[in-house]
A protein has these predicted regions:
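Short, acidic/polar
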Residues: 40-52, 196-203, 306-313
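Internal, glycine-rich beta/alpha segment that forms the wall or movable "lid"
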Residues: 2-18, 32, 103-210, 222-225, ...
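Hydrophobic faces of well-ordered beta-strands that scaffold small-molecule active sites
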Residues: 20-24, 61-63, 92-94, 122-126, ...
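An alpha-helical appendage that flanks or caps ligand/catalytic pockets
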Residues: 2-16, 22, 146-179, 221-321, ...
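Conserved, mostly hydrophobic/aromatic
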Residues: 20, 53, 57, 65, ...
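Acidic (Asp/Glu)-rich catalytic clusters
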Residues: 14, 54-55, 80-88, 111, ...
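Active-site mouth loops of central-metabolism enzymes
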Residues: 28-43, 97-105, 187-197, 295-304
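N-terminal beta1-alpha1-beta2 module of alpha/beta enzyme domains
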Residues: 1-87, 91, 189
Length: 358
């Protein structure tokens, strides 16, 4: 494994700052007659959303890989290359790339290409996949879920070091002294590991010295403090420079708390109960939603003031360096998402900075 430099795009930002990003899976909306929105239209609207996020000064924009009818993004790097040509400053990444069902060499090559097009703004988030449609689609056995990720992460780490690769494993043919192109121009590819909350995943990320992002979609974010502490302790134990700790949670910003909740709730409920039916969860309702919107809950829904206070509380409770809002949730309309993005940059971000400076 190649060590990170102490400075760089994923170095910790300090106790009085937090970076704000956005991510989306390209949730498929509804047309006026209730039929699903065409996937192509969703992708074109995503480009408008990325442009706006850049224009209002947000730090990062990520798109998550899925292979199902309710999400439009199946090839994050293709979208990110298009977004790179239409943005100037914002970092562009996946959220996440399902490494287990992909080729680590091709993942690196695609992101190094995006990095070149964007002049050094690419990053990749790697995950095992909480959705598993890619495994049968690409011919992988779910029984190999663990070994696929472990071996492919090991290979990716070697490729990322930009030296000749020597690797052997069970999941693909061996490599002996081969080089991978194109290399990155300015730095190693910023590489995150997305985790759902198991100590094993946290320790694996720390072993590689990669920054970590926790997907917090329920309960109370402060409950992740032991895992954040475990990560920091393990990074130090492995002798790596400290890296950023981030979280990802769903949410929506509108001018008032009432407007944000009433606008967001029906779309959140559709998504929550659709996924819940697939995963054996019980049905959700308004009480669960309101609890998640409370100050200690995992939904960042409300006015700019409310959302900013929740993000500042997250910073104090977990010491995170970055917060990514999953701003698309179910069939939430494009116009509502655009307003939410604008408010995140123009109202939430300055309020968070004010709260953390005080």
């Amino acid at each position: 494994m190649m060590a990170e430099s102490a400075a760089g795009p994923t170095a910790p930002v300090g106790k009085d700052r937090i970076l704000l990003g956005l991510n989306t899976f390209g949730d498929v909306g509804e047309q006026p007659d209730g039929s699903p929105q065409p996937h192509a239209e969703v992708l074109r609207q995503l480009l408008e959303q990325a442009e706006l996020a850049d224009a209002v000064g947000l730090h990062a924009f990520g798109v998550g890989e899925h292979h199902r009818k309710d999400y439009a993004v199946s090839a994050p790097e293709v979208f990110l290359a298009a977004a790179a040509a239409r943005t100037r400053q914002i970092r562009l990444g996946s959220a996440v790339t399902v490494l287990s069902s992909d080729d680590p060499i091709r993942v690196f090559q695609r992101f190094s290409t995006v990095d070149a097009i964007s002049n050094g703004r690419a990053e990749v988030m790697l995950g095992r996949g909480s959705f598993v449609e890619s495994f049968p689609l690409f011919g992988f056995d779910l029984a190999d879920y663990e070994v696929l990720f472990e071996e492919k992460l090991e290979l990716f780490d070697q490729v990322r070091a930009q030296k000749p690769v020597h690797w052997e494993g069970r999941t693909r043919p061996a490599l002996h002294g081969l080089s991978v192109y194109p290399p990155l121009e300015h730095h190693l590819l910023p590489t995150w590991i997305g985790v759902g909350g198991t100590p094993e995943s946290v320790l694996r990320c720390a072993q590689y010295g990669y920054p970590i992002i926790f997907a917090i979609i329920g309960g109370q974010p402060r409950g992740f403090r032991p895992l954040a502490d475990l990560y920091r302790e393990a990074v130090a134990k492995y002798g790596h420079p400290m890296q950023q700790v981030a979280t990802h949670s769903p949410g929506h910003v509108a001018p008032t708390d009432e407007e944000a909740r009433e606008e967001f709730f029906p779309h959140w409920l559709k998504l929550r109960n659709r996924l819940g039916a697939e995963r054996g969860w019980g049905p959700a309702g308004r009480p669960e939603f309101d609890a998640l919107c409370a100050p200690e809950g995992a939904l960042y829904v409300g006015s700019p003031e409310t959302v900013a206070r929740k993000i500042a509380l997250l910073k104090r409770n977990l010491g995170v360096d970055r917060f990514d809002l999953k701003y698309s949730n179910g069939p939430l309309p494009h116009s509502a998402m655009m307003r939410s993005i604008e408010l995140m940059g123009t109202a939430v971000a300055p309020k968070v900075a004010e709260l953390l400076a005080g």
